[in-house]
């Protein structure tokens, strides 16, 4: 969410894989994590069940792919929002705003990621993505004079994620929360 590196997404996936992922988003939006079954996904995508397993080892791999694709979208948005911005508070602010905006547009995937945080088979990959974003904020925090930049980066990432959760629940931007994050970064 505080990414300051170029996107790391792979080349565009196949059309069928994209259709399955798109169907997964629609199913997640309608039924949440508990209702996200392989059968519902393939029915929504209009493909045979065996096709699912050509692209994904199992449901867990599919959930991980949904989360990875979401983070690819975040990385692209953050890269665009921070292009040409030197390390510092403004760069982190722009990155956080881009992350929050992508979360609002991708409500189903963000909600799914929140539900999946307690899934032991997904915790490691989700934590690695979180850490990648937090780590990317360290140069900006150091430029701002934070001696404890790594710990601060984790806290800023957590605050930004909490704002995303609150906005997800509200179904809209929460300007006061975003202002509070900006004020924290200006400290």
What are these regions (language model features)?
Residues 72-75, 94, 101-105, 119-144, ...:
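Amphipathic alpha-helical packing segments from all-alpha helical-bundle domains
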Residues 65, 79-105, 153-156:
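Hydrophobic alpha-helical connector segments
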Residues 13-24, 41, 66-78, 137:
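Generic hydrophobic, amphipathic alpha-helix propensity
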């Amino acid at each position: 969410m505080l990414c300051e590196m170029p996107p790391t997404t792979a080349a565009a996936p196949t059309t069928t894989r994209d259709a399955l992922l798109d169907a997964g988003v629609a199913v997640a939006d309608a039924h949440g994590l508990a209702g996200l079954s392989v059968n519902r996904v393939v029915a929504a995508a209009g493909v045979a069940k065996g096709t699912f397993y050509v692209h994904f080892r199992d449901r867990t791999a599919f959930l991980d792919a949904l989360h990875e694709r979401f983070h690819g979208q975040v990385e692209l948005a953050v890269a665009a929002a921070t292009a040409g911005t030197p390390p510092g508070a403004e760069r982190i602010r722009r990155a956080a705003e881009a992350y929050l905006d992508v979360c609002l547009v991708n409500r189903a995937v963000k909600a799914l990621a929140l539900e999946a945080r307690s899934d032991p088979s997904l915790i490691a990959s989700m934590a690695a993505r979180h850490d990648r974003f937090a780590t990317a904020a360290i140069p900006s925090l150091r430029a701002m004079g934070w001696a404890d930049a790594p710990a601060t980066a984790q806290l800023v990432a957590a605050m930004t994620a909490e704002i995303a959760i609150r906005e997800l629940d509200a179904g809209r931007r929460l300007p006061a929360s975003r202002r509070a994050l900006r004020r924290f970064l200006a400290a």
